[in-house]
């Protein structure tokens, strides 16, 4: 049995299979998942697990070169945004798009990870970097 890192087998496989520029979305309870895109549903109840908890684990285990966020998070959820930005390396590029555009972009991710997060615009697309 694995004792460190990502223990959820679906999340671990997703992280292990990422190549350079592959994208994964971590979303809140309300984010729709396009047909044909795998959904890894971690939600247990409203708020559990939180967006930040899931983001922390992923950032510990994958190299991220870019993140994509909804522009609306700046006004609708500034606390979530400031906590999120504090976790990113200075080398990580940050792109803001409209929430509708972010939802369209989920059509090109490897998977959407659904959290129990119940605050607005708590969605992020992580673009994988490369270690060489």
Swiss-Prot record:
Entry's Gene Ontology BP terms: D-ribose catabolic process
Keyword match Hydrolase: no
UniProt subcellular location: Cytoplasm
Binding, substrate: 28, 99, 121-123
Isomerase as UniProt keyword: yes
Coiled-coil residue windows: none
Reaction catalyzed: beta-D-ribopyranose = beta-D-ribofuranose
Pathway assignment: Carbohydrate metabolism; D-ribose degradation; D-ribose 5-phosphate from beta-D-ribopyranose: step 1/2
EC number, as in UniProt: 5.4.99.62
Keywords: Carbohydrate metabolism, Cytoplasm, Isomerase
An example Gene Ontology molecular-function term: intramolecular lyase activity
Catalytic residues, chain numbering: 20 (proton donor)
Top EC class, one word: isomerase
A GO cellular-component term linked to this record: cytosol
Function description: Catalyzes the interconversion of beta-pyran and beta-furan forms of D-ribose.
Subunit structure: Homodecamer.
Similarity-based family: Belongs to the RbsD / FucU family. RbsD subfamily.
Protein name listed in UniProt: D-ribose pyranase
Lineage: Bacteria, Bacillati, Bacillota, Bacilli, Lactobacillales
Encoding gene, per UniProt annotation: rbsD
């Amino acid at each position: 049995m694995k004792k460190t890192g990502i223990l959820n087998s679906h999340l671990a496989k997703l992280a292990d299979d990422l190549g350079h520029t592959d994208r994964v979305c971590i979303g809140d309870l309300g984010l729709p998942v396009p047909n044909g895109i795998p959904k890894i549903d971690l939600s247990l109840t409203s708020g559990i697990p939180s967006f930040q908890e899931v983001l922390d684990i992923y950032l510990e285990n994958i190299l991220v070169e870019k993140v994509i966020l909804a522009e609306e998070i700046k006004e609708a959820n500034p606390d979530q945004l400031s906590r999120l930005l504090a976790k990113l390396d200075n080398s990580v590029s940050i792109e803001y798009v409209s929430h509708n555009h972010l939802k369209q972009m989920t059509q090109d991710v490897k998977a959407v990870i659904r959290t129990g997060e119940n605050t607005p615009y708590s969605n992020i697309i992580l673009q994988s970097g490369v270690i060489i």
